[in-house]
């Protein structure tokens, strides 16, 4: 008996890694459905190989004529609203949310309320509306297993430890492409440089986030909500080798770390198989091959966005939502060559300063905070407030 999987974001890096895992275990999992944003050629390739029941093309600007309404036995859906339809399909048992950005919020909620097992790779969902998501997970008794490598590592460690013994959780970070660049040279970083990452092959938005360690800031906020750990018990260390993915410090002074080859197939396979063990070796990486492992504190002058994430998380309410939306809007401006790399955290800071923090109860209130934050970034750009600083 195979388990039916719905994969949201099949054409991205996490989506491609998920497909690798499905290929490795055809007797265990079946791709029931998947989504792409606008990569129709990729959609056709995946459909030909996996023959799913449904495909969702979420972009409102997709050329419907390329795929039509049916491809072989596969039904084609269009638009962001169809993402929710996809995850609610009765046959779907596991939903992997690999969509980048706050667009993943509503389909994630749909999966939770429909009682699906959730492999969550869309960190923005918990960042933007953590308290709401927490309450829905508890209400619907939803099983959630994180897919991000760091959170999955911590999940596995914490599951095996007595919670009363835990002192602190540590997220590791490569430090990005500019970890050794003199700080004064960050002002001249180009888009081409910022789109390169030393460890992971990711999409443009996540690569930009990672090179400024804003991605790690988002992960700090996500870890707070996933594991119910206060911010003063969450740490970040630079680990250039990207072999240790998570560390748990114990009250007695000992530490446990989770190590593997830096490949997303490990956390994805764990998420799909949980609570059962993954039955075969995915990629052996014995300790004798690790070489030297380095760990160091992050420099918040080099990575101001990381510090802003901790601040926003501690404030709570809509502050993390504003942080995320302002970052998405600023990264979009950077990718259009309208602002500099080092100005991204400045736009986030200014946006947080300009918007009143609320403590909402509904999804619509969080979405309104998201909208206002994006609009504020555009207004700041038009007024040249940040550039003038």
From Swiss-Prot:
EC number: 1.1.1.267
Binding site for Mn(2+): 148, 150, 219
Pfam families from the UniProt entry: DXP_redisom_C, DXP_reductoisom, DXPR_C
Entry keywords, A to Z: Isoprene biosynthesis, Manganese, Metal-binding, NADP, Oxidoreductase
TM annotation in the entry: none
Superkingdom, taxonomy of origin: Bacteria
Keyword hit for Hydrolase: no
Function of the molecule: Catalyzes the NADPH-dependent rearrangement and reduction of 1-deoxy-D-xylulose-5-phosphate (DXP) to 2-C-methyl-D-erythritol 4-phosphate (MEP).
PANTHER family cross-referenced by the UniProt entry: 1-DEOXY-D-XYLULOSE 5-PHOSPHATE REDUCTOISOMERASE, 1-DEOXY-D-XYLULOSE 5-PHOSPHATE REDUCTOISOMERASE, CHLOROPLASTIC
Family: Belongs to the DXR family.
Name assigned to this protein: 1-deoxy-D-xylulose 5-phosphate reductoisomerase
């Amino acid at each position: 008996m195979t388990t039916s999987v719905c994969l949201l974001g099949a054409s991205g890096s996490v989506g491609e890694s998920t497909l690798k895992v499905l290929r490795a275990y055809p007797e265990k999992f079946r791709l029931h459905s998947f989504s792409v944003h606008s990569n129709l050629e990729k959609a056709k390739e995946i459909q030909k190989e996996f023959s799913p029941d449904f495909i969702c093309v979420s972009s409102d600007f997709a050329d419907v004529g390329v795929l039509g309404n049916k491809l072989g036995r596969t039904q084609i859906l269009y638009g962001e609203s169809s993402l929710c339809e996809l995850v609610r399909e009765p046959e779907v048992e596991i939903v992997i949310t690999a969509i980048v950005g706050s667009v993943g919020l509503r389909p994630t909620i749909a999966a939770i309320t429909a009682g699906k097992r959730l492999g969550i790779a869309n960190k923005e969902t918990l960042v933007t509306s953590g308290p709401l998501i927490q309450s829905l997970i508890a209400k619907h008794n939803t099983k959630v297993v994180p897919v991000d490598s760091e959170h999955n590592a911590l999940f596995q460690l914490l599951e095996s430890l007595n919670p009363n013994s835990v002192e602190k959780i540590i997220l590791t970070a490569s430090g990005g492409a500019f970890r050794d660049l003199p700080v004064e040279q960050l002002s001249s970083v180009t888009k081409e440089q910022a789109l390169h990452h030393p460890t992971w092959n990711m999409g443009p938005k996540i690569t930009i986030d990672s090179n400024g360690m804003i991605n790690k800031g988002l992960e700090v906020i996500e870890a707070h909500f996933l594991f119910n750990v206060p911010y003063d018990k969450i740490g970040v260390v630079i680990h250039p080798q990207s072999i240790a993915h998570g560390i748990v410090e114990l009250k007695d002074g000992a530490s446990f770390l989770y190590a593997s080859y830096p490949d997303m197939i490990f956390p994805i396979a764990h998420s799909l198989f949980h609570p059962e063990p993954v039955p075969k070796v995915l990629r052996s990486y014995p300790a004798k091959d690790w070489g030297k492992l380095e760990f160091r504190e992050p420099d918040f002058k080099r990575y101001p966005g990381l510090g802003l994430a901790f601040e926003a998380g501690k404030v709570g309410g809509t502050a993390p939502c504003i942080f995320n939306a302002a970052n998405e809007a600023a990264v979009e401006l950077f990718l259009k060559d309208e602002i500099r790399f080092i100005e991204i955290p400045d736009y986030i800071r200014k946006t947080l300063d300009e918007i009143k923090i609320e403590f909402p109860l509904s999804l619509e209130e969080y979405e309104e905070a998201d909208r206002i934050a994006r609009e504020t970034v555009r207004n700041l750009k038009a007024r040249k407030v940040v550039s003038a600083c």
